[in-house]
Amino acid sequence: MTTQQTIKVQLIRSPIGCQESHRATVRGLGLRKIRSTSELVDTPEVRGMINKISYLIKVL
């Protein structure tokens, strides 16, 4: 069995006032409220989303 690597991210800043695409990216990562966390599979797509909104989140 292969185990997939995961990345845990936490929303630390509100996406209010940000670009619509950045808000959609936050929702796409499964984050809703401030301090909410989401555990995601480590893929290039997810890393790109994290890089796009790095000023809003923290990688745990």
UniProtKB/Swiss-Prot annotation:
SUPFAM superfamilies for this protein: Ribosomal protein L30p/L7e (SSF55129)
NAD in keyword set: no
InterPro entries: Ribo_uL30_ferredoxin-like_sf (IPR036919), Ribosomal_uL30_bac-type (IPR005996), Ribosomal_uL30_ferredoxin-like (IPR016082)
Any GO BP: translation
GO CC annotation terms, alphabetical: cytosolic large ribosomal subunit
Gene Ontology MF terms in the entry: structural constituent of ribosome
Pfam families linked: Ribosomal_L30
Domain of life: Bacteria
Statement: the UniProt record of this protein carries the keyword Ribosomal protein: yes
Record keywords: Ribonucleoprotein, Ribosomal protein
Gene3D superfamilies named among the record's database cross-references: Ribosomal protein L30, ferredoxin-like fold domain
HAMAP family the UniProt entry points to: Ribosomal_uL30_B
Family: Belongs to the universal ribosomal protein uL30 family.
Subunit and interaction comment: Part of the 50S ribosomal subunit.
NCBIfam families assigned: rpmD_bact
Name of the protein described by the UniProt record: Large ribosomal subunit protein uL30
Organism: Albidiferax ferrireducens (strain ATCC BAA-621 / DSM 15236 / T118)
Gene: rpmD
